Amino acid sequence: MHNSEFLSPVQSGTQRGTNRSILNNKKSGKGKKKSVFEAYMTKEEVSAGLKRGELIQGPLRINPKKFHEAYLPSPDGVRDLFIDGVVPRNRALNGDVVVVKLLPQEQWKVLKNDVCEDDDTPGHSTGNKQHALSPHLMKSSAKNPDLIIEAKVDSSAEDGHESALIGCLQKEIKDQDKLGAIEEKTSKQGDPKTFSDDCFQKTAKVVYILEKKHSRAATGFIKPLSDKSSDLARKRALFSPVDHRLPRIYVPLGDCPHDFAIHPETYANTLFICSITAWRDDSNFAEGKLMKSLGQAGEIEPETEGILVEYGVDFSDFPDKVLQCLPQDLPWTIPQEEFQKRKDLRNECIFTIDPATARDLDDALSCKPLPDGNFEVGVHIADVSYFVAEGSALDIMASERATSVYLVQKVIPMLPRLLCEELCSLNPMTDRLTFSVIWKITPQGEILDEWFGRSVICSCVKLSYDHAQNMINHPDKKIEQHELPPVSPQHTINEIHQAVLNLHLIAQNLRKQRFDDGALRLDQLKLTFTLDKESGLPQGCYIYQYRDSNKLVEEFMLLANMAVAHHIYRRFPEEALLRRHPPPQTKMLNDLIEFCDQMGLQLDFSSSGTLHKSLNDQFETDEYSAARKEVLTNMCSRPMQMAVYFCTGALKDETLFHHYALNVPLYTHFTSPIRRFADVIVHRLLAASLGCGPPLKMPKEVIQKQADHCNDRKTASKRVQELSAELFFSVFVKECGPLESEAMVMGVLNEAFDVIVLRFGVQKRIYCNSLPLVNSHFQQVGKRPELTLLWEPEKKGEEPVRQVISIFTLVEVVLKSDNVPLKYTAVLKSPEAQ
């Protein structure tokens, strides 16, 4: 949907939630300019309203493809509050923490199952970033969008919400001047008050912005104002963000290139960064300033920089005051007094296992057999807190960045590269400072003893996951020197090989026990790219294989994180920084349970463990079953909430500490301090608890604030990583396409269906009106959605070919690059061509 609806509602039907009297006033141009938005409440009014329970606060989530729809978590945790329109959103941007006021019940959204097909329940939505309505339907529905009956949707999903509204458009709202009116009824339904509460979704309007979480930066394009003779056009240009959730922005003409006013067409494909500086209550448009020109749209580096700026990722060079916090005498060596304070493990067989390209090696493993048949297993983590003094300029900047950001082509580090890749990185045959957790453990994974402390190690080899996997796959093979990177002469290859095998044995038992105890893992397909060394363009991509060597490392990292969580919580019950994972969202989970029942799928959602077991027991190992499992795993991931950091003193109910997916009472992050600031705080807590570090200066309120910030940056980092992969895949399709693949249907609407492209793991929507069809027909078979396609025959006189599309149908698709930069289309091959 284009931003034209946001800018010129009169041209494309008035938006729901837009007051027509405002529009009429703007058209007339007479008299004083009226306010488009309500004035915000005062801080005092907001504080009093929150205390009385009259107002609700929470993070705002705006639908990426229907920018006039926004959502706020409901206090009851069931169905999100619905903010219907740009005006009720009141200038808040995606991610902002806002305060809302509920609208009267007659303005709530009516939800009804049997009116039209729902695009956000399982089987009807994939959560991918595609329009639910086919393009020609979107045009027709935009003409009169005021009064609709919506299918019963689950508004908690991040990306869906687009309902197929065939035959659902009704007469206009009689009371056109009522702001935010969303009365949805038909003559058959009668008075909305006769419905039960389940038939409604509460609606609200924003009355205050508590915290502007959004960066207020946007990537987009500049263009002249349409009325070039106006005074405004001589002073301003119009900035159109790529992200339609943002308003269009007036920018000073002086910020634009010097020849823009004369030759605007020269910059039609140039990406710019704009910063929003103000948004008055009497304007549909925000005000801002151009920050810089990025380059041509569709090129990797300009697009990447745009993503980073939009999501507030600091990719600037570290300033001198930060670099001054690092050791200045290089090459740096460990001070002699540190050896006296630490356990010396330099003679132990310790090694790293990481991706082949990794340079920030923050964890190492050891496994020594004991005479009694048990093992001494160690997890050794880079001692970042030794170099990052609390309160230093380095500490402050690291806390602000909070996480390293991993793009396809590079890493934006949390810490200066001198630390990430040298002083803290556990590089082979180099003495390094570490924090260790060492267990005495049985082959079955039973822990007999546990030790925490600061240490010094010297890794004997840098193994990749491929190296470790080769050792696991060939337990009896003699690994030759040329098959590995350089190995320390202190340890034999056979010794390392045996240690990997022993770790693998213990890890298998630990993993089995974890899942027997009720853990859940939902693996989704992840794309990896190979890049051309000269151009940096993607020359290949494949789905990453998660193998036994990955699982080996994961099990011991989990074990260390859980052990440290219990330790610091015992010592600091009010100040411990832990990580919790709330259970799935109730409404979405109930929808998924209903869908599985309709599809005859025997899944048990009663706990994380039963879900994991039933999901894995449901399918065989053939390719079709694997594809079905992938579709179902994707559906199961949608109700899941994000895991979050928190300070134990901020939550009084200890049951809320629980980690749903791991099914453990306490968990934290300890094992990646080079790339996560939360781990640095945990290291400080651990050091303080052991008496080998200074007391922590941060009170629990500050720890909670830092935890919230880490959560925000983690979310942003995850999204940036996804967008980077999407960017590279779009370029890959352009450079190497068209690409053919098998795909499986994972959602069916009445004019479109969603597929997961099995070769690449991407999700796309295919519209019926883009196919050479005689016609298409949607129906419910029982409660299962089904779309029948009648293809135009290839030769005259032949009968149309019939194809039935339903959940789990296998189809053949072709991915083709569009003319628009970074866009590609999935085209369904006709049954005759398959």
Swiss-Prot record:
<dbReference type="GO" id="GO:1990074">
    <property type="term" value="P:polyuridylation-dependent mRNA catabolic process"/>
</dbReference>
<feature type="compositionally biased region" description="Polar residues">
    <location>
        <begin position="1"/>
        <end position="23"/>
    </location>
</feature>
<dbReference type="GO" id="GO:0005737">
    <property type="term" value="C:cytoplasm"/>
</dbReference>
<dbReference type="InterPro" id="IPR001900">
    <property type="entry name" value="RNase_II/R"/>
</dbReference>
<keyword id="KW-0378">Hydrolase</keyword>
<keyword id="KW-0498">Mitosis</keyword>
<dbReference type="GO" id="GO:0003723">
    <property type="term" value="F:RNA binding"/>
</dbReference>
<keyword id="KW-0464">Manganese</keyword>
<dbReference type="GO" id="GO:0000956">
    <property type="term" value="P:nuclear-transcribed mRNA catabolic process"/>
</dbReference>
<dbReference type="GO" id="GO:0000932">
    <property type="term" value="C:P-body"/>
</dbReference>
<keyword id="KW-0694">RNA-binding</keyword>
<keyword id="KW-0131">Cell cycle</keyword>
<dbReference type="InterPro" id="IPR012340">
    <property type="entry name" value="NA-bd_OB-fold"/>
</dbReference>
<dbReference type="InterPro" id="IPR033771">
    <property type="entry name" value="Rrp44_CSD1"/>
</dbReference>
<dbReference type="InterPro" id="IPR041505">
    <property type="entry name" value="Dis3_CSD2"/>
</dbReference>
<keyword id="KW-0132">Cell division</keyword>
<dbReference type="GO" id="GO:0019827">
    <property type="term" value="P:stem cell population maintenance"/>
</dbReference>
<dbReference type="InterPro" id="IPR041093">
    <property type="entry name" value="Dis3l2-like_C"/>
</dbReference>
<comment type="function">
    <text>3'-5'-exoribonuclease that specifically recognizes RNAs polyuridylated at their 3' end and mediates their degradation. Component of an exosome-independent RNA degradation pathway that mediates degradation of both mRNAs and miRNAs that have been polyuridylated by a terminal uridylyltransferase. Essential for correct mitosis, and negatively regulates cell proliferation.</text>
</comment>
<keyword id="KW-0043">Tumor suppressor</keyword>
<feature type="region of interest" description="Disordered">
    <location>
        <begin position="1"/>
        <end position="35"/>
    </location>
</feature>
<keyword id="KW-0269">Exonuclease</keyword>
<keyword id="KW-0963">Cytoplasm</keyword>
<feature type="binding site">
    <location>
        <position position="354"/>
    </location>
    <ligand>
        <name>Mg(2+)</name>
    </ligand>
</feature>
<feature type="binding site">
    <location>
        <position position="363"/>
    </location>
    <ligand>
        <name>Mg(2+)</name>
    </ligand>
</feature>
<protein>
    <recommendedName>
        <fullName>DIS3-like exonuclease 2</fullName>
        <ecNumber>3.1.13.-</ecNumber>
    </recommendedName>
</protein>
<dbReference type="Pfam" id="PF17877">
    <property type="entry name" value="Dis3l2_C_term"/>
</dbReference>
<dbReference type="Pfam" id="PF17849">
    <property type="entry name" value="OB_Dis3"/>
</dbReference>
<dbReference type="InterPro" id="IPR022966">
    <property type="entry name" value="RNase_II/R_CS"/>
</dbReference>
<dbReference type="InterPro" id="IPR050180">
    <property type="entry name" value="RNR_Ribonuclease"/>
</dbReference>
<keyword id="KW-0479">Metal-binding</keyword>
<dbReference type="InterPro" id="IPR028591">
    <property type="entry name" value="DIS3L2"/>
</dbReference>
<dbReference type="GO" id="GO:0000175">
    <property type="term" value="F:3'-5'-RNA exonuclease activity"/>
</dbReference>
<dbReference type="GO" id="GO:0046872">
    <property type="term" value="F:metal ion binding"/>
</dbReference>
<dbReference type="GO" id="GO:0010587">
    <property type="term" value="P:miRNA catabolic process"/>
</dbReference>
<dbReference type="Pfam" id="PF00773">
    <property type="entry name" value="RNB"/>
</dbReference>
<dbReference type="Pfam" id="PF17216">
    <property type="entry name" value="Rrp44_CSD1"/>
</dbReference>
<keyword id="KW-0460">Magnesium</keyword>
<feature type="site" description="Important for catalytic activity">
    <location>
        <position position="362"/>
    </location>
</feature>
<keyword id="KW-0540">Nuclease</keyword>
<dbReference type="GO" id="GO:0051301">
    <property type="term" value="P:cell division"/>
</dbReference>
<comment type="similarity">
    <text>Belongs to the RNR ribonuclease family. DIS3L2 subfamily.</text>
</comment>
